[in-house]
């Protein structure tokens, strides 16, 4: 119920603008015909507008006298939910915004705070009619320009609405862009808001995808926040990736990679919000089409999977885990597809020439080193670098140099070196865009380092200490063998000779005292032995058989009967490997960063950049058993 002051003492002309008494008929086009407003209706409308204008001005006059009663009435009406019929209508809102924009200093006091807050928190303001929306945005600009302290509140509201689809946040970004240029110092607290309002990993896929889309759009016009935005995205994706891997590990042998690769993702409303109004209450809900197979941010944001074969549907524990895997995988799939598609658009020959693309790549490389590489057993996040590096030959060179530098840096921790070598071997094996020159270069680097290592340290094998002392050597040798399994066809020169003299090199390595066939990943060594024998590079099966016999007899290490007793004791000690240390190394050796993806849309996006085992092995084995 609108309250008005007593206006009986004021003459009518104070309220009503002079109206031409000539009978006029105003017509508006309508889809069903013409809508006619009679002169009396026009008079009522003008009279109503004039009365409301007078009421607002009177409320401001009272506010100047420290009476905020009428301002409070207006603020309460503005603060009502959008579905409440008592909320201020668009015409009166136009009047209010016009008057306040011209009298912004009159509501600067604490008594005007509630009115300002009710306006900046106006529910679904982005859905206002264009004319009213322009007045609303103008008021916000006047407010924050005249009273800068309000920009912090406004920017927080704008960022909190990033859960809306990108089509609904056009005005949000326009205002952010405007004020980031006007008040560049505000980037500090906006950076905080970006992290604060990022949806939880257990939130809906729609919100996660929409928020990611809006962050990427913000990065497009605010390069100063670029690193913070990429860092935030990488952290959140890693969080989902790791949780997904943990849930997969909990299933143990109930589900394998083949099952996950065969899943079919379909829209399923049951896995999404129970109500479509959820986003409306938290800034809105609308439609948005994501590119390149990314899931539609406005549709039900959980895609169903086919029932995983081998699962016992009667076990509630497994059913819950399967449901969690479905939800996490669809979220991860959508976000990664969106991010990689965006990155591909940013790293073009033109952008690299201008330097902008180089900046994006360098940022992602830095975050790979600081966030991705130290995180154990991520399954999908690393494909961002896998994809972006293959956009240009120079970027692949840069990524390879990064991995080599980390793998053999003196000051790096041993675990990080081994992890980097795993990435190096997996990347060379799987990256389809790599040139032969790049592959031969890496192989040459590895063979040179391994040869030098054997020459310098082979005698240490007979000294006291466990074989874990040489895990760096084993990681490098395994990486090279893994590369050879995938790329053996390109290691012959035009005369049929082996590049890097691989035939001599491998034979020397496998018979060295380090016995790499025993301490490297068993599956990789078996496949290497099979291919090496087929290609007449090295003969390993007799050594592998001898190693297996030693294990069966419970003999750890080797014993040389020709040596003295104290030397034999040293050998036994040197060949021993504590169970915990060995298991840790085995786990690390068994990690292949670029194993096949099971995220449906993301796997499709990676297809032209990725070498399947079936493409490289020919007659050997399927991709399911290469690792």
Curated annotation (Swiss-Prot):
One of its GO terms (cellular component) is nucleus. It is found in: Nucleus. InterPro entries: RNA_pol_I_trans_ini_fac_RRN3 (IPR007991). One of its GO terms (biological process) is transcription initiation at RNA polymerase I promoter. Its main location: nucleus. Residues 263-282 have a biased composition (Acidic residues). The keyword Nucleus applies. Residues 263-305 are annotated as: Disordered. It holds the Pfam family RRN3. One of its GO terms (molecular function) is rDNA binding. Disulfide bonds: none annotated. Keywords: Nucleus, Transcription, Transcription regulation. Required for efficient transcription initiation by RNA polymerase I. Interacts with Pol I in the absence of template DNA and stimulates recruitment of Pol I, but does not remain as part of stable preinitiation complex. Present with 138 molecules/cell in log phase SD medium. Monomer. Interacts with NOP53. PANTHER family: RNA POLYMERASE I-SPECIFIC TRANSCRIPTION INITIATION FACTOR RRN3-RELATED, TRANSCRIPTION INITIATION FACTOR IA RRN3. Belongs to the RRN3 family. This is RNA polymerase I-specific transcription initiation factor RRN3. It comes from Saccharomyces cerevisiae (strain ATCC 204508 / S288c) (Baker's yeast).
């Amino acid at each position: 119920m609108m309250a008005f002051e007593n206006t009986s003492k004021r003459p009518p002309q104070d309220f009503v603008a002079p109206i031409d008494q000539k009978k006029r008929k105003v017509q508006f086009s309508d889809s069903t015909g013409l809508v006619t407003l009679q002169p009396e209706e026009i008079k009522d409308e003008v009279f109503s507008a004039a009365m409301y204008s007078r009421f607002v001005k009177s409320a401001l006059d009272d506010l100047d006298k420290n009476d905020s009663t009428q301002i409070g009435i207006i603020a309460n009406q503005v603060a009502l939910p959008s579905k409440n019929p008592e909320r201020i209508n668009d015409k009166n809102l136009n009047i209010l915004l016009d008057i306040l924009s011209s009298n912004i200093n009159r509501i600067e006091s604490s008594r005007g705070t509630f009115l300002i807050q009710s306006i900046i928190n106006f529910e679904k303001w982005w859905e206002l009619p264009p004319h009213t929306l322009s007045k609303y945005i103008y008021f916000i600009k006047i407010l924050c320009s005249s009273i800068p302290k309000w920009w912090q509140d406004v920017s927080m509201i704008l960022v909190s609405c990033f859960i809306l689809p990108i089509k609904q946040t056009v005005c949000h970004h326009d205002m952010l862009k405007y004020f980031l240029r006007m008040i560049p110092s505000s980037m500090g607290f906006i950076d905080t808001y970006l992290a604060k309002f990022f949806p939880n990993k257990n939130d809906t896929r729609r919100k996660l995808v929409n928020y990611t889309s809006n962050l990427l759009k913000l990065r497009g016009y605010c390069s100063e926040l670029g690193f913070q935005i990429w860092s935030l995205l990488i952290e959140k994706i890693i969080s989902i990736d790791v949780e997904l891997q943990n849930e997969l590990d909990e299933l143990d042998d109930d589900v394998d990679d083949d099952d996950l690769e065969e899943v079919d993702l379909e829209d399923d409303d049951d896995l999404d919000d129970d109500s479509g109004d959820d986003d409306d209450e938290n800034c809105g809900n609308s439609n948005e089409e994501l590119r390149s197979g990314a899931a539609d941010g406005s549709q039900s944001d959980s895609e169903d999977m086919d029932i995983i074969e081998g699962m016992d549907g009667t076990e509630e524990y497994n059913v819950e885990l399967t449901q969690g895997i479905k939800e996490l995988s669809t979220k991860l799939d959508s976000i990664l597809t969106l991010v990689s598609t965006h990155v591909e658009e940013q790293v073009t020959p033109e952008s690299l020439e201008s330097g902008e693309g180089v900046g994006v790549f360098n940022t992602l490389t830095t975050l790979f080193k600081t966030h991705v590489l130290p995180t154990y057993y991520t399954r999908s996040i690393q494909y961002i670098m896998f994809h972006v590096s293959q956009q240009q030959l120079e970027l692949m060179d840069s990524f390879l140099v990064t991995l080599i530098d980390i793998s053999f840096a003196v000051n790096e921790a041993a675990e990080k070196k081994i992890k980097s070598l795993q990435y190096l071997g997996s990347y060379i094996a799987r990256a389809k865009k790599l040139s032969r020159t790049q592959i031969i270069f890496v192989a040459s680097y590895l063979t040179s380092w391994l040869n030098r290592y054997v020459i310098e340290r082979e005698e240490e094998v007979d000294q006291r200490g466990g074989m874990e002392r040489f895990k760096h050597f084993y990681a490098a040798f395994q990486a090279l063998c893994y590369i050879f399994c995938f790329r053996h066809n390109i290691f012959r020169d035009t005369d049929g000779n082996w590049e890097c003299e691989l035939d001599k090199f491998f034979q020397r390595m496998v018979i060295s005292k380090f016995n790499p066939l025993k301490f490297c990943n068993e599956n990789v060594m078996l496949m290497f032995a099979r291919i090496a024998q087929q290609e007449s590079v090295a003969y390993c099966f007799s050594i592998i058989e001898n190693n297996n016999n030693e294990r069966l007899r419970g003999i750890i290490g080797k014993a040389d009967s020709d040596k003295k007793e104290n030397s034999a004791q040293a050998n036994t000690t040197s060949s021993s490997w504590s169970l915990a240390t060995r298991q840790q190394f085995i786990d690390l050796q068994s990690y292949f960063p670029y194993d096949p993806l099971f995220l449906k849309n993301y796997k499709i996006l990676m297809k032209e950049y990725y070498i399947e085992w079936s493409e490289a092995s020919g007659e050997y084995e399927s991709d399911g058993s290469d690792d």
